[in-house]
Amino acid sequence: MKGSEYALLVARETLAEHYKEVEAFQTARAKSARRLSKVIAAVATIAVLGNVAQAFTIATMVPLIRLVPVYLWIRPDGTVDSEVSVSRLPATQEEAVVNASLWEYVRLRESYDADTAQYAYDLVSNFSAPMVRQNYQQFFNYPNPTSPQVILGKHGRLEVEHIASNDVTPGVQQIRYKRTLIVDGKMPMASTWTATVRYEKVTSLPGRLRLTNPGGLVVTSYQTSEDTVSNAGHSEP
């Protein structure tokens, strides 16, 4: 046989020393792996606790069930800006929100169409303080003989067009409008009216009502008077 086919003899003392070195190396690696696992677990725990704390802080500062309206407007240079509070809008933008909301209230209260009567009834009721709401509902509901439901039903309608809005005092606005009575088979009859609206701004309005009342307005007093003499139309209390 050739010499390369024979294994080299290793002294027993040398072999024992080699085994000790291998065992010590493996033990050191195992300890290092355990330490690394503990560090990773600690970092993961801290990250989870941090995320939980952050989520709790956000939920406390901004309740998730709260609906916050965002107002958008176009600046003179063409850029778009936004704000979440009416009181922090530029004066002209806050006035625009108030004017639009009050006009929508008057328009739906003074107009009538059988197809949209329920929507108008609900919005006007939600916009109104308790006493104003009661007066409106007593006027509009059956069996009041002056209610447009009784007089017009599905055979006519009242159309309302805006003329002007003017602030009388803080929290009081007068709105002039044209109202046209249209009855099937008859000539339309137009008249002009003025509505005097007293209102307040509230911050505790439920989220569902903010969708149709972003300004948070509540009408506390409402009166109408006819400007022109006409045999068409009427005014509720």
UniProtKB/Swiss-Prot annotation:
Main localization category: membrane
Origin superkingdom: Bacteria
Keyword Transmembrane attributed: yes
Short name of one Pfam family: VirB8
Alphabetized GO MF terms: identical protein binding
Stretches of the chain found on the membrane's Cytoplasmic side: 1-38
Transmembrane spans: 39-61
Membrane topology: Single-pass membrane protein
Listed Gene3D superfamilies: VirB8 protein
Entry's localization field: Cell inner membrane
Family: Belongs to the virB8 family.
Task performed by this protein: VirB proteins are suggested to act at the bacterial surface and there play an important role in directing T-DNA transfer to plant cells.
Protein name, UniProt field: Protein virB8
Organism field: Agrobacterium fabrum (strain C58 / ATCC 33970) (Agrobacterium tumefaciens (strain C58))
